[in-house]
Amino acid sequence: LDLRNDPGGLLQAAIGVSAAFLPEKSDVVSIKGRTPQSDYAFKAVEKDYRSGNAAKALAELTPAAKTVPLVVLINSSSASASEIVAGALQDHKRAVLLGDRSFGKGSVQTILPMTFGEKTVGVKLTTARYYTPSGRSIQARGIEPDFYVDDTPKGNFPTFQVREADLAHHLANQQDAKKSDKDKKAEAEALPYDD
């Protein structure tokens, strides 16, 4: 499963792709927001990959997809939804991850519509963090592959070696025991959570 240079997409699509390769009712991802009411756990359910947009791409999927040996390719441009898939498959020991550490986007955004006169705009607000089935936060850390392999220097899809942790004011990972003063300040300014 090649997730290199996949910047992510919809949460439901990531859950659907994960469900295609995991046993029924396996944990895929959990989301934790500011309040317990916003916490939610998503499980692998067949309807998630046999309905909606995923139905066409995965309609011919055989039951063997859940047991065939699987390798997932990731790199520094694998982000967000692709990290959800890679993390779920790795945590369940369903796949071996090969490549480079992923981008490290472990946050959930919500688009809030705002109307100004006749114009409607949207504000993207970070509202939660997501965690792999084992409880790992990949925010600003990324997913570590099981085996490191450098990207080829030449190819059709050059990658940028920029990760979430390289961005100014990135959301820090709360699971990091040792945080720099810069990370603590960035976290306080970005979105203060109490874990």
Regions found by a protein language model. Give the residues of each.
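C-terminal "post-core" interaction segments
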Residues: 3-195
